[in-house]
Amino acid sequence: MAVVWMQQNFQQLIEQLKGTLGKLGARKLIALGLVGAALMGAILYTSIYLGRPSYETLYVGLSRDDVNRMGLALGEAGIPFDVKSDGSSILVPIGKAENARMYLAEKGLPTSNNAGYELFDNMGSLGLTSFMQEITRVRALEGEIARTIQAIRGVKAARVHIVLAEKGSFRRGDQKPSASVVIRAEGGFSAESAQSIRQLVAAAVPSLDASSVTVLDTNGHLLASAGEGANGAALMTASLEQQVASHVDDSIRKALAPYLGLGHFQTSVQAALDTDRRQTKETTYDPESRVERSVRVVRESGDSRNNRNDNATGVEQNIPQEQIQNRNGESSTEKTDRREELTNYEVNSKTVSTVSDGYSIKRLSIAVVIDQARLLQTAGTTPPPANFVDQQITKIRDLVATAAGLNTNRGDVINVTAVNFLDPAGADMEPVSAPWTDTLLRQSGSYANALAILAAVGLLIWFGLRPLLRDQNVKPAGTEVAIREAGEVATPNFIGGAESVGEGVQAVIGGPAAYADQMKTSLSDLRQRMRMPAKLRLEQMIEMDEERVAAVLKQWIHETASGREADPAKASAMPELKAA
């Protein structure tokens, strides 16, 4: 029943709205549509205009000198501007950014002190000496290198100074070039970046060694100095040790987190690395795999005789053609035979050369601190078993040793301790709420949008719906019947078809509830009767109650004759009679 009643009310509302719009006429409908469109446009424009910020960014990442020069230029042009708290961004009112950029570009802003090869664009070739050209070339090279350095993450600004070797006919020794770099670093700058800057500058300048480049920051801290090649290696070693320690620490945390939970343990890892370069050459021979390459055989044989005469020298030896017999002497005979054989073999050999340019872990030192309260919670019983903590520490030590890859032969050390952790600082502190004024200022745009929308809706109701409601609430003429006290004329019951005055009066006197019920049940009949021609409606009224119609006509004639104005509440009882 409730759904049917809602449908009937909705249909009645639609019919009433159609009837009301039909009574307004074409001019009023057009005016109402224009007012609604204007209000919707005003709401949309107000929402967009108040929702965007009052200032927009013009340039970001500017140096202080550029900000000062651009501020002076905008002030001369009469363009309002604002500078952010970091001092590197300029804001202008919305809609003036394009004009401001064009004006600043005309003034050559923003510009930088690091001018590059564009120095040659503004320089004439006539009247320049070789010295001036060389100075300009060095300045341009310094500016280009500084621009490249500023592109590195963590470098806000850079300044480069280069000293090139001077060539001369009367110089005996060769002068080596050198360079210095001053940077303004931010949070993301590291020591490895300083070494990268040295390599960059050395590669950009001919005959410049990286060891001759000095890098420092604006705070006066020396990041890399000339002639410190060993220092660079030490920095690389320290960075490598830090990376290895971080990797081992992550492995330990991944192993302990599922068991103890994050926040219930702390780890510390120290790694000592050996980064010495090693070169090993090893040659291996295989005697089992010999091959006969050549054979050499030498044979020698000999026969020798030796006679010795012991006769004394005299006349007989000096007589010619005289055979002298050896009477006394010694004789010997020697015979030799030698054989030499030489065989050459080819033996397989293997030569291995090993160059180690990496690193090796000399020692690891690991410390693990565990929350004892959390460790006792894992027991599952209260109180925990005896020696429970010691057993758990032993298990955790083995787990950490496996996760970190400890080797006791190289002297690795591990220490696991269970203690009671303190409550984190500020855990019981309540968050400080921001003042309501700050919240109001941050939400001022939203509040302005809401007020604008409410104002637009109010205007729409005042200028659009209010006239419609006023026309709807106007009672149609003839809904009430003027009752004369003397004639005892009651309100006619034209809807229900009452036959006597008493029944009509009783319907009205029955109270608001009875009257509302009667109006609901007869509303459809009344609409049908109102659509009928006036002549037919008048005939039906006369047929229903002739005496009442006659009484009303007599009252009108009497009022017209006396010149007295009729009461609207009484004169509007029978609109059908007036329409007729």
UniProtKB/Swiss-Prot annotation:
Keywords: Bacterial flagellum, Cell inner membrane, Cell membrane, Membrane, Transmembrane, Transmembrane helix. InterPro entries: AMP-bd_C_sf (IPR045851), Flag_M-ring_C (IPR013556), FlgMring_FliF (IPR000067), FliF_N_dom (IPR006182), YscJ/FliF (IPR043427). It comes from the Bacteria. The chain crosses the membrane at residues 29-49, 445-465. PANTHER family: FLAGELLAR M-RING PROTEIN (PTHR30046:SF0). It is a multi-pass membrane protein. Pfam families: YscJ_FliF (PF01514), YscJ_FliF_C (PF08345). The M ring may be actively involved in energy transduction. GO terms for cellular component: bacterial-type flagellum basal body, MS ring; plasma membrane. The basal body constitutes a major portion of the flagellar organelle and consists of five rings (E,L,P,S, and M) mounted on a central rod. The M ring is integral to the inner membrane of the cell and may be connected to the flagellar rod via the S ring. The S (supramembrane ring) lies just distal to the M ring. The L and P rings lie in the outer membrane and the periplasmic space, respectively. It comes from Brucella suis biovar 1 (strain 1330). GO terms for biological process: bacterial-type flagellum-dependent cell motility. Its main location: membrane. The keyword Phosphoprotein does not apply. Residues 273-341 are annotated as: Disordered. Belongs to the FliF family. It is found in: Cell inner membrane; Bacterial flagellum basal body. One of its GO terms (molecular function) is cytoskeletal motor activity. The keyword Transmembrane applies. Residues 309-331 have a biased composition (Polar residues). Residues 274-308, 332-341 have a biased composition (Basic and acidic residues). This is Flagellar M-ring protein FliF.
